[in-house]
Amino acid sequence: MTESFMGAGAPADASEAVVLGAALATVYGDRHPQASGAPAAIRSASRRLARFAGNYDFDIDAPFATWLRHIADGGDVNTARADAEGNRRRITSAIGAIVDRGAMPVLLGGDDSVAEPFVAGWRDHSPVTVVHVDAHLDFRDAVGGESHGYSSPMRRASEMSWVRRIIHVGQRGVGSARPADVQDSIDAGNTIVRARELVSVGAEAVAGRLVPGERFVIVYDVDGTDPADIPAVRAPVPGGPGAALLGDLFAALAARGSLEGLVVTEFEPELDPKGTSALALARLICR
């Protein structure tokens, strides 16, 4: 790691949130892990924002990044394309260590397969709800015989005893989900808030799906955002919520429940030549 998120220092006992990077977890076959450079790109973009810490932020009507001294950056989890099982184990261990200390992990992926071991980090703790922001459902049992790839993390999360339920948000268009996958998620007690509903009713109404004080984590696949705002993704789907609306949603969720962690996935720096998607993501994380 050559840069830290927002210039944050190394983790200390007093750190309230710790940023980690994970380039990949479980890659499908011989596909190129195009999101592997995302942690470095997001960190680099965040440094453009760090110089404004303390300045007025029009989106929150308050000074920007007053929390900066409370966060740390723990670098990247070691991952290797040929060691999917080891990748998942190391990511879960790193997240669990942060949760054990009472801090909040913020994981910068990486493709969406890192979401499964991220959620697994709460296995020794009180149950959490997963708020899954994504254009796709990610509820396939397996694709090509692989049950831990990026089409399956929410299916695997739903099988974890410490996951209370999943609130899917932002789904639209057509992807890998089949009718049976949608029904399976509903039958498991999960909720689907389609993109059109979020845009129609707004952030506060969707955040109201949480019980006040409910412990939750956010799994944010970047293609959940409309590609007009953040185009640098593998599977863009038009018609989604804009970055501003998602920022409002994240803030509303945090105000209503107890945010325990955040993972950001599926951003592909190779598709972001001007760095605007990375900057938008760094900004969303700061919300």
PLM feature segments, named:
Residues M1-R287:
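Conserved alpha-helical scaffold segments that buttress catalytic/binding sites
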